[in-house]
Amino acid sequence: MAALSIHHFRQAKQAGQPLVALTAADYATAQILDRAGIDLILVGDSLAMTSLGHSSTLPLTLEQMIHHAQAVRRGVERAFLVADLPFLSYQVCKEQALLSAGRLMKEAGVNGVKLEGGYPDMVETVAFLVQRGIPVLGHIGLTPQAKHQLGGYRQQGKTPSEAERLRQEALSLERAGAFALVLEHMPAELAAQITQQVGIPTLGIGAGPACDGQILVTHDLLGLSERIPPFAKAYANLREVIREAVEAFVGDVHQRLFPPT
């Protein structure tokens, strides 16, 4: 099974082949996703909420991200593996971003990193990393690390000025060398416009069907999350399946039916 390279993503866009991306934070999940044919596996900072029980992504540390990315790496053979840079592991200066990204590549073996935002300083940071051989996945629209500044998990790009800002951010990140862009929680029409104007692939999450691919949080996809965003879809209800299995085990033990005699 040949591992996917960074070239796969632009080739897929040119061929009109939709890309599929999901998140993973542990070995078993990563192995399942990889064998299912996922193009990109993201060790997302959403693990702060889905795996560690925090109310936002902000508490996640770089050390925790490295720990989870190492586990995911062991389960991935084919997919392109990207890790989020946690809050305050890259915003101080571009040199800090380089050290954080470098540690994730050296210690966890990821193929690239994801940074949130498309403002001028962040575009400069993206270019700085790319010039030093680090593939970067951009992320604009709703950027969860900025939830307080944005006033919560609200749709972005609804006004003409916001939409124009996001279009310009997408172009700037492409020029900086990002290999793809995550477009999160923005109007479908705006995401379609951005997808048409950039030469790199777009991965939508709550951004309509016209993006070059789609990305979801795996816990949402599998019905493991307590609350699923309105733009996501649960393809299973594993929360209920797991509960029923555990309750069946508890019942068997209480009735001395397990282990069998």
Curated annotation (Swiss-Prot):
It is found in: Cytoplasm. It is an enzyme of class 2 (transferase). It comes from the Bacteria. Keywords: Cytoplasm, Magnesium, Metal-binding, Pantothenate biosynthesis, Transferase. GO terms for cellular component: cytoplasm. Belongs to the PanB family. This is 3-methyl-2-oxobutanoate hydroxymethyltransferase.
